[in-house]
Amino acid sequence: MSVLVGSVVTLGMFWVVPTGLALLDGPRPPGWDLLRRSWPLFAVPGGLALWLPRSGLSTALAAVYALATLALALQAPARLFLTRSLRPGEVAVLTALVAPSVAGLALVAERAAHPLLGFDLDILALTVPHFHFAGFAAALVAGLLCRASDGPTARFAALSVPAGTLLVLLGYFVDDWAELAGAIVLTAGMTAVAFLTLRERRETATDRVTRGLLAVSALVLFATMLLALSWALGEATGLPHLDLTWTAATHGLGNALGFTVCALLAHRRLRSRRPTPPAPPAPAQNPPRTAHPRTELPT
């Protein structure tokens, strides 16, 4: 695994996933808080697996991290059972919970030098950051934006980002044209995320730092998704395009640092400045009954 890919995945394991999980509201299934708090501990073996040579040891360390991603994926049906909701914003959140498990499985196969389902090791290596950032972070941000503004654009973003990510994955099994279709859907969804982010910058953010973070995350997203679309189009049609290494260095690094990090920092700042809802008033108590003298006439 290259230094660039390893560095990006390390960021995803140690910071992106726990930071994103801390931004989620709603019901907490059993084990949620324990898993969220202990995530950095599971990221340690995963991070070590990235930097060690391919071996039985690195495979075992990757498997420990993969088990944590599987535990996170199991939180999705548990959350669905509690919410009983498939609203677009909730679909995006459920997708975010499941996506790291795909990355975990790909990491185990890549560290074991096993061409899982026929994919070569380079594709498996790039699958790991893809499902930490496009699968988890982008879906999570789309879900957060949909909860903040449940309009048509927000609902489109919350559905098309998970759908595009899934279609890109299915394209690996079909052909380059199917992967291009997934890239088009994902680019449309991420473009909607960028527009919503700029609107949130204008309407919600009040301080300069948060506004700057939102602006950077949105503007970077426009550029990086065009690079991804260009690569998918070139692979399908044979038109000139950046090779996989340069696409990872531009689209991948830009999405990781320019979009994901800035967007999560901005949403964390927005969350910390969100006014705390007032406590519900205490229920009114019936006044105690006072004793009244008997008024009956004696018999």
Regions found by a protein language model. Give the residues of each.
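Hydrophobic alpha-helical transmembrane segments of multi-pass integral membrane proteins
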Residues: 1-281, 289, 294-299
